[in-house]
Amino acid sequence: MRIEKGIGIKNVLKIMCPGTQLREGLENILRAKTGGLLVIGDDEEVMKLVDGGFYINSEYTPSYAYELAKMDGAIVITGDLKKIVCANAQLIPDSSIPTYETGTRHRTAHRVAKQTNNIVIAISQRRNIITMYKGDIKYVLRESSVILGKANQALQTLEKYVAVLERVINNLNLLEFQDLTTLFDVVTAIQRTEMVMRIVEEINMYILELGNEGRLISMQLNELVKHIERDGILLIRDYCKDGLQYNEVYEHIQKLNSSELLELDAVARTLGRGGIPLMDTLISPKGYRMLSKVPRIPSNVIDNLIKEFEELSNIIDADINDLDNVEGIGEARATAIKDGLKRIKEQVSLKKEI
């Protein structure tokens, strides 16, 4: 599984992406060019900063938010976004809290967000920009057309990266069946998989920002990546040094910065195989990835096979009786494994010829 990054901003974007009631209200205020200041949450920490205004305690609707924003003061909405607590309120945060904003509305929003750790939204009257603050986080909401353009560009980049990854994996598949895999081939495949997954993360952020307008992008993304992450994890499991936990290795790879990821030696070190020549070191897979492609073979049976034979080449060379002796494998399953691996080998050879 991927390490969750930017959980705070993701949770905020979910409640204010296109298609939500809150976003509709913000867009109405933006189009009216009245400007606005909204605080999400009516806890004690927020309410003690509120001065004046009038209490409404009415159901939240986008049209109510738009009408109330015509007044200069702030609008306070409950944390569940169901009620407008008060409107035309003056917010008086601690003036000693540092802020780099210039406009009065944005300075107030920034300070309130820092002091209460609540979501505060400032809508600029002149610049037509919606800015969200939460704690130290500042995020400017962009128009859907801008995000769509960036998402489509990222998808085109992803297509090219996936095509390169497929070529690398096809080459690796052939070498695995010939038992001629080098550390260079393995590390290149893992590096390329991680590059693809990082672009996927970026596109997922765009999808989150687009809300209900991101469905087509999401469908295209799912079609492109399919089982890439799963195969990448199995690749790590096949080649990481004995004694290392494959999920921890995967986490270390995710933590590599962009320049480290470009260094194949750095990727090799995460597998516990640093300091050895990449091109000249032959390395045999355990077989998790290839065996996972054989239909109807449970994971515990794959574990038993690898525990017994240790390497994929030994499993390929084993006859049906040898496979039958492994716990959880009868004659029928042994035949299925043998035939399945043979079929995969033929498919791999055909792809190479093409």
Curated annotation (Swiss-Prot):
Superkingdom, natural source: Bacteria
InterPro entries cross-referenced by the UniProt entry: DisA (IPR050338), DisA_sf (IPR038331), DNA_integrity_DisA_N_sf (IPR036888), DNA_integrity_scan_DisA_link (IPR018906), DNA_integrity_scan_DisA_N (IPR003390), DNA_integrity_scanning_protein (IPR023763), RuvA_2-like (IPR010994)
EC number: 2.7.7.85
Cofactor(s) recorded in Swiss-Prot or TrEMBL: Mg(2+)
Reactions it catalyzes: 2 ATP = 3',3'-c-di-AMP + 2 diphosphate
GO biological process, one term: DNA repair
Record bears the keyword Secreted: no
Entry GO MF terms: adenylate cyclase activity; ATP binding; diadenylate cyclase activity; DNA binding
Binding partners and assembly: Homooctamer.
Protein name per Swiss-Prot or TrEMBL: DNA integrity scanning protein DisA
Name of the coding gene: disA
